């Protein structure tokens, strides 16, 4: 797969572990600071968009929000990797590989109800590094293959962080997204 790729990854030390995901791509446009950038124009100029970092159901902090959904809907093989990205993808009827709540820091583990005696900074770092390495290994593959690779190899083996995160990795394919758009349209126009 040789797509013109755009990467949104806000410059943030706490998400540097995600850099290997796009380090091996052919020249990609990497945006780490959205100031003075026309995000919509950048999205329009690329075949796929990889979005990484911290976020919420409304988007990727400092980079992507609801105003970008129509443009993202025209792209293929997008990756949405931030906390609650799945809610953003589903709400806007998008497709791609996405994560739900994704623990990448010890505070997030505590917030997510993981018992404190079952993890450490080491286990969180191990989970982060393994996830990024596995995504990087199949970044050129079709999304169903990347998704299967993650499910096959991002295994808990006693790590509650990986167990939690693994359950929240989803591949949202065009059929499901199309049904969501139809459902939304029906709701808006009874």
Q: Where are these predicted regions, by residue range?
A:
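A short, glycine/acidic-enriched catalytic loop
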Residues: 55-74
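A short acidic (Asp/Glu
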Residues: 15-20, 59-63, 89-93, 107-109
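A generic structural signal for alpha->beta connector loops
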Residues: 25-27, 75, 93
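Active-site-proximal beta-strand/loop segments in catalytic clefts of secreted hydrolases
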Residues: 9-11, 52-54, 81-85, 99-101
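A domain-level signal for caspase-like cysteine endopeptidase catalytic cores
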Residues: 1-50, 79-80
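Active-site-proximal C-terminal subdomain of hydrolase catalytic domains
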Residues: 78, 86-190
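Helix-loop-strand module that forms the ligand-binding subsite of alpha/beta enzymes
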Residues: 68-88
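A generic local structural motif
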Residues: 35-38, 64-69, 82
